[in-house]
Amino acid sequence: MTATIIDTDLLTQARSAVETAQGVIHTGIATAKESGTADQDQQLVYSLAHAASAAAMAESALTYAQTGDDEARLAHVFIGRQLTDLASMLWARSSDWGVEPSALDATRAYAAQVTAPAFVGLAAAAPGSANLPDDLAMVATTFRQFANERVAPYAEAIHRHDLDIPQEIIDGVAELGCFGLSIPEEYGGSASGSEDDYMAMVIATEELSTASLGAGGSLITRPEILARAIEAGGTDEQKQQWLPAIASGETLCAVAVTEPDFGSDVANLKVSASPEEGGWRINGVKTWCTFAGRANALMVLARTNPDPEAKHRGLSLFVVDKPSDDGHDFRHEVNGGTLEGRAIATLGYRGMHSFEVSFTDWFVPAANLIGGEEGLGRGFYLQMAGFENGRIQTAA
């Protein structure tokens, strides 16, 4: 890092701007509470939540800005863009937030300065230091080397020809412990329960993605989601059965939530799981199930309560075992049921392949209902516990 000559005046302006933004957001939240219409105005609630998250990140950026000149420029650009986004939210709906349209005017000069092309260009030319402790810096170095040596040589061919990810990459990622970054040590993973667990996962994802998103960084997402769901609501037996296998890479995972007619509108999902002796029969179609071919375990969100009024409370989460398949399609007939998948052509996200998966009377043992009997109706909540971690990884 070069000698630090941080512009303290600009930093003071940034701090004042963030405080102004936080005040506007707090007023908006209070206004929404007082109106009693939050349930009816989900767009407003979403905007407030988005703005509050952005303001919290901007506040953290103020600390980062004090570590060096390059870091300060990056922080200023980030804060300026968050202020610009907030201003656009207020432009048409300031009255709903309980503030005047001019509420952010005091921040305009600062935002204009730090989002100007010349200023942004300086920030882009000097990305700054990651400021990682030694152990996490080693994580970055290890995965950067793996990405350069083992992933990058295959990346172009995988993308241009929509090839499968070579087993060499999957085995290498498993050997590095990638699939167990968020799985507790007692189940064969490396998570110790500290915030560094998240950082290690984010760093590994970033480094692998520099070589290839589809054939590197995104390999970790599905194991993260399923493992977190099992940790959040699985029985002790299920944790012992599945978590070590996920951590080692023996079990490769895919997620089956989205449906053709409903997207991710979870409350109205239709894929059903009907009880029968010893287990369940699943029927319906899921789509955008990335890695569903190669995976030998699908996390499936299905409706176990047929009453449509049950909405998201009528959903349960299953681990559906299947054979691992190469290529762009698969079909299996077992126990009187059929499981069939076809890859969906995608523009830039190749290697793992995203599938449409059809279940016809596909049998799932009772032991594969996450949480057992206590997991009935908890599928949405367990899925969200998984997605919470998976989305952090996806953002990386």
Task: Enumerate the language-model features and the residues they cover.
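Amphipathic, small/basic residue-rich leader segments at the start of a protein or domain
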Residues: 2-38, 42-49, 63-66, 98-220, ...
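Glycine-rich beta->alpha junctions and the first turn(s) of the following alpha-helix
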Residues: 2-56, 128-139, 335-396
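Short secondary-structure subsegments characteristic of cysteine-rich extracellular domains
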Residues: 58-84
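N-terminal glycine-rich flavin-associated loop
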Residues: 216-236, 263
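A short, Trp-centered hydrophobic/proline-enriched beta-strand micro-motif
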Residues: 249-257
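Glycine-rich phosphate/pyrophosphate-binding beta-alpha loops
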Residues: 264, 287-293, 389-393
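A structural signal for short hydrophobic beta-strand segments in well-ordered beta-sheet cores
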Residues: 271-274
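A short core secondary-structure module
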Residues: 283-337
